[in-house]
Amino acid sequence: MCAPSDHWRLGSKDIWETIETLSFHQSDKGKALDDFQLLIDLHKNADRQGPGGDAESEKALSLAMVDRAVPLKIADIGCGTGASALLLARLLEAQVTAVDFLQDFLDGLEGRAERMGLSDKVTTLCCSMDNLPFGDEEYDVIWSEGAIYNIGFEKGVKDWKRFLKTGGMMVVSEITWLTADRPSELQEYWQNEYPEIDTASSKIEIMENNGYSPVAYFVLPEHCWLDNYYRPMQDGFEAFLKRNGNSEKAQAIVNAEKKEIALYEKYKAHYSYGVYIARKLV
């Protein structure tokens, strides 16, 4: 559930394939894993690993017209440390399967669920989002905030469709252009980070072409980025660096995050996460 520009395109098996298949020397493999562990360390204690908000998740739930009194099965794919999974469990009569490929994040989720008295409603599953062990038409709702980019928007809505019951709801957030024209610096940055970034109309067309009926769409507001994600991350930079001995690699990660934050603050009128809500037709 991390922002694409955090270099967290890792919810599938990509990181492991990269480590195993690239022509690394053994020492380079170790360095890659060390870098990965630093990223986990930066994010694992956060409430969120990407832009979002409880009010916005509840808005999506309302727009999806999910009956709060009916027992449901929900899969939250790319759940991170569980902000959305726990909200769904709290608000609904639902059994939530919270999926992430990072056990560190799931450990945090399980601790939060226990403290909130929700352990009986949330089951964690550590696996890749492109190798989900679900049955056909197993779920009433598939939910994924800030994570579908890991395997690509089109692949995600296409592959996950079979897990949804007919008439079930897909709720996903995806990085989205808000303007027709963008500064070249921003365009180049995102084309490098996530080439599938596109306008809402293009994303909605993809859902329609893959057997969904669009129900609603809205844009995450600025506070979901700044107040709920970036500012808490910034508050943790000093402790993160201290934990990791102010190493060059840790400092490089912090600098990359600062660059990303500055880019958003400069160009926030041009992009955000869009929340896409659609019903499975067939």
PLM segments and residue spans:
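Conserved alpha-helix/loop element of class I SAM-dependent methyltransferases that forms part
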Residues: 50-70
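Class I SAM-dependent methyltransferase SAM/SAH-binding core
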Residues: 75-77, 81-131
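A short acidic, Gly/Pro-enriched loop at the edge of an enzyme's catalytic core
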Residues: 130-141
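A short SAM/SAH-binding and catalytic strip from SAM-dependent methyltransferases
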Residues: 141-154
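A short glycine-rich, Lys/Arg-flanked "PGG" loop and its adjoining helix->strand segment in the class I
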Residues: 155-169
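Short, glycine-/aromatic-enriched active-site segment of Class I SAM-dependent methyltransferases
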Residues: 175-194
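Short alpha-helix
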Residues: 196-211
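Conserved Class I S-adenosyl-L-methionine
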Residues: 218-282
